[in-house]
Structure formats: structure tokens, C-alpha cells
Amino acid sequence: MADEDLIFRLEGVDGGGSSGAGRHGDSDTDSDDDEGYFICPITDDHMSNQNVNSKGQGYYNNLLKTECGSTGSPASSFHFKEAWKHAIEKAKHMPDPWAEFHLEDIATEHATRHRYNAVTGEWLKDEVLIKMASQPFGRGAMRECFRTKKLSNFLHAQHWKGASNYVAKRYLEPVDRSVYFEDVQLQMEAKLWGEEYNRHKPPKQVDIMQMCIIELKDRQGQPLFHLEHYIEGKYIKYNSNSGFVRDDNIRLTPQAFSHFTFERSGHQLIVVDIQGVGDLYTDPQIHTEKGTDFGDGNLGVRGMALFFYSHACNRICQSMGLAPFDLSPREQDAVNQSTKLLQSAKTILRGTEEKCGSPRIRTLSGSRPPLLLRLSENSGDENMSDVTFDSLPSSPSSATPHSQKLDHLHWPVFGDLDNMGPRDHDRMDNHRDSENSGDSGYPSEKRSDLDDPEPREHGHSNGNRRPESDEDSLGSSGRVCVETWNLLNPSRLHLPRPSAVALEVQRLNALDLGRKIGKSVLGKVHLAMVRYHEGGRFCEKDEEWDQESAIFHLEHAADLGELEAIVGLGLMYSQLPHHILADVSLEETEENKTKGFDYLLKAAEAGDRQSMILVARAFDTGLNLSPDRCQDWSEALHWYNTALETTDCDEGGEYDGIQDEPQYALLAREAEMLLTGGFGLDKNPQRSGDLYTQAAEAAMEAMKGRLANQYYEKAEEAWAQMEE
């Protein structure tokens, strides 16, 4: 068979072969037996099955030598070619699982196929021939599935018995046509992250099934269907978009993959709802920071919080340098129950796993794919760039109390990275095309009903007719793909970020205040944990919700610059009314008073007007002032002035106007302080009279005529003292 007759290139694979090809019903356990060859069971010679483990290990070692040494020899290339050709011959002679349904006898339909390129963000159109069963063979909460055969565009004759089996899915209830396109975008974006995960050489590689849209032009209304390959095997749901993990399906790889996507994307997204056959996944869900992409299943930071509440870091997470998410002691005890179950998983680490963000990995991080360009920029800084890690310290400094326990993760100190300029990156090796795509045929599960976001509209563009190759999400040519990726906004590079608060705090400490408050997605995740605890999501109906854990996450959110958390803790520790965790009251101690005032002062510096007034009054009257401070009218005057000038958005992006404290009242208090002097403030009758006049004018605007007259009189009295 000539090379050009293949629908994929014959070349060496980086750290593993095609994931998911040939997965079967036994794939619900992490067995290491199917990894003796990187080209999995379909290529195993029946004469060498007894030596598969030893030969597989030798093959793996030779592959490592090839990667680290020369670019490869003709002998090694020949080995790959023969293995792939052998696999193709075996695949050709496999029986058709749908032969009994005689789909070849169904009428042929013309369809327009829409495929999405996740790298360029473009939609491509071509024409295909299909045969679809009239009755569904499976039905879920939202969609139903139809057996389908699609004829390859490479064929010159219509040989339907040899056509590939597909699953066509459509929604049970009518939905906007844009929903179909949005679903494909989601799955192809998730496929990109699966490929990024595989570049870090995990023990088991993953793959997301290829999915496209077919438009049946000859039917009334030209209905749309999702189209995926059919894959035999046992379909398992490993986690959901609401953080649920089945105890009898505990596995390491799916959970580690979700955790990896959160850190590798710089906290901008997480891929969850992992389900499929073995490590060939379908119908995933992506949670993004704002939650405005990818339909109603995108729960935003709340979905991220739900995942980490139930996630127990496993040995794959540790081998890839993924930092554990901070949980309270009580939450950690609950997660430890899952940790015990993880001991039964059979995945064996090879010891060659790359750390997340390792300089040895030539990833596609030279620029952002369209999804990351669409996401909120809050998690990144304008001058931030993706730099290689070999010039950085291998462990964080001890600036925070939890730094020492994170040294083994080899995360760099982020404080010096946010203001660095772009650096040259090594070009990535040509990315191989993938023909591994399919589906278990299982209908999609219903998305979570936790949210009801505003509807989104996503259009699509038409492209030229493309060859039949079911290319992976990076396109049909690895070389073209990498060149295209590198052309996309090379100045906007993203850096992996750990899930640990201590390391995120180090990064934020290097930023100025305006770029620190409200800029951490990790802080928003911890704040979402607070809301879930307060709402009773993490407890049974007849149980009290965990107040200690809620305060734990509220403090972590405040440490990460979440203004709402900072204000809430300031009010809570100061024994003042607070809207977040309103039922929680803390003991009134000097230590808590100091904490409360420090939080309020931090919130005031961040632009929260209510906190400015509280701090000013504390310095003015001495009430609610921390024990280590004393009355200071000059400080009070400063914060009164700042509050008066604050009429726009604070650093958290929220608008806080002057309705809570009338402007004329603050001006009158300033005038009174300057008229009498004291507590470090010198008398200034002239300025006092001016402020009384401004207060009178503000009172007149507020329809307070009698009060305005009083202020005018006091202004005259102040100016009289100046003349004396």
C-alpha cells in the first residue's frame, strides 16, 4: 500500500500512539497491559502476545532514544509503516457490528457536512453521502441516536457494506440551529486540550472523538444532526459537569486530565463531564471563567468549584506536577475517602511524565487558540508572556506559609513573570494527523440545571470543499497547523498556573493593586465554594452547612484579591452587618478587630467606597479602629476625600455610587474637622468655609433646603474665624 493512499501520515509518535483506537469493554479499569505497544492491541501480532510486555518496554525505550537522539533512521520509519499497514489490514477484516441491520439497503441521502477547525476557528463545508436508519437505537435525556453509514469521498464506487459506521444525534426538543454548531466547537476545543495533555507523556493518552454536523438538504426543514464515529465498548461516565464522580468507576486518567486542563490553560477553563469508552471521550463540557461559551452546561467558575470539591489528586496529578486545590480540613477528610478508592486503580507510572509547563515539552503554547482569545482577560495580564521555565527557579520561595509543602511540584516563582516581554520559542515538531475518532453511540446526558445563563448566538462561516480525511482538531496537515497557530496573536501567550493559593499569591504580590484585585480566576473559584456552602449544596438537607469551610474559602478568596471576599471579611471581623455568610458571627477579640480593620483598609485601597467611609469614620471617631491604631483626623480626611471622589467603578469592576452616604454629609464632616482641628489635623477655617459651601450646594441639589441654609451659616462662621 502506497503512503499516499493512507488517510494519515506514517511517522513516529511522540510518547505514545493513538489513544482510544480499539478500546473495548474492559477499559473501565486502568490496566497497563494494553500499552505494551504504542500502536495498541489491533497491531499486536498473535505470535508475540506472550512477550508483549517485555517487547513493549524495549520498544518504548528505543522510542525514547530516537526522540532524544537523532531524527530517526529508515529502519525505524519502516517499522512504523509496517505496523500501521498491519493494523489497517486487520481493521479491514473486522466484522461489521451493524451488519444485521442492513443499512446498505436504506435510501441514500445527500448531506452537507460542517467541520470546525479549532486552531483557526473556521468552519469548512463539503458534500457527503449517508444512509441513516429511520428509527433511533438510543435515547437520552436530551438527544436521540440513529445508526448511520457515511461513504468516504475517497472512494470512486459506492461500496456501502464497507462504509464506516457513524452515530447521528439530534435534540429531542427543537433548539436553535446555533446550538449544534456550538456543541461541535466545544468538542473540538476539548480535543485540542486532549492533544496538549498527551504531549506531556502521561501514562495513558486520551482522545476526544471527532464530531461534525450534517445538514440533510433533501428533508423538510433541512434538519441538522451531530455525526460521530461509532465505537464498540463499554460506555462509562467518569465525572460530570457538576463535579460528580462515581465510586465504582474511579479512575486516575479522566480526573487528572480535567485537573491538567485547568492549570495548563492558566485557569481560563476546565474540561469536565468526561465519559466514553476507555480513554476515548465524547460529549465533554468546558467551564470557562465567565460561563458565556458553549451553552447552558457551562457553569463558569461554579463548575470549576464543583469539580475541585470532589477531586482527589492522584499519582498522575503528582507526576505531572499539578498542585492540589486548597480544601478545608473537613473537606479534605471527605476527599480522603475517595483517595483510598484510588489505590485500586491499576495505572502504572512510567516515570517519564512531563511537568505541566515543562520546558522540555514543545507545546502549541506559542500563541492562543481562538477559544483562549475569546475568554476573559481577567485571568491574564496584558504584558504577561509564556516563558520557558529553564531560566526560572525550580521551586517557589518561602514568601507564603504553605510554600515549603509545594516545593516538590517544581513550580516557578510567578512574581517575576507577569511583566516579562515575549521570548523566542522553539518550533514544535510537526504534529501528526490523527484518525482516531469515534463514539460509543450513547446519547448525551442532560446538562446540569444549576444555571440558566443568557442565550448565546454563535454563527459559522462557510469554507471550501476539503478532502475526506477526518483530520484531528489541528487540521489535516501538522506543518500547516503549527504555522497557522503561530500566526495567531503571538503576543498573547499564556502561562500555566497552579491550583494552589500559595503560588497564586506569589504571582499577585508582584502586581500593582489595580491589576491584583479581581484578576485571579482561582479566587473566584474559592468564592464560588463559599456560595455553595452557604446555599447548602455540600450538605444533606437535614444537616447544618459547614461554616468553617465557608470561612476557609472566603479567606483564600480574599488573599487572591476578590473584593467581595475582602469586604465581607472586613465587616464580619469588625462585628458589622455583612451580606455574605450573613448567618456567621465571629468572636469579638482584639485579633479579630485588627483583622477586620486590615481587610477594610485593603478594600478601601482597592476602591470600595463603603470601606473608605468605614475606615474614615474609624480614624475620625475611634470606633471600630484596630487596637494597634489611634484616632488620626488627617487619615480620616484623606479617606473622606477619596470617598467623595469615587464615583466610578472600583477595582473589582463594580459601580458603587453615593447613594449609601450623601455627599453633603461627608463634606460637612470634613468642614467640621477642619474648623476645630485636632488628632493630628491643623485648623483651616478658610477651607472649612469652602467645604461648608460645597455641602450647602450638594444639599440644595438633594432638595434639602433647610439643611443647605444651615451649612451656609456655618460657612460664614468659619470665614469669620479666618478674619479674626
Curated annotation (Swiss-Prot):
Coiled-coil parts of chain: none
SMART domains (UniProt xref): Alpha_kinase
One annotated Gene Ontology cellular component of this protein: dendritic spine
The enzyme's E.C. designation: 2.7.11.20
Domain of life per record: Eukaryota
Similarity section: Belongs to the protein kinase superfamily. Alpha-type protein kinase family.
Annotated protein name in UniProt: Eukaryotic elongation factor 2 kinase
Protein encoded by which gene: Eef2k
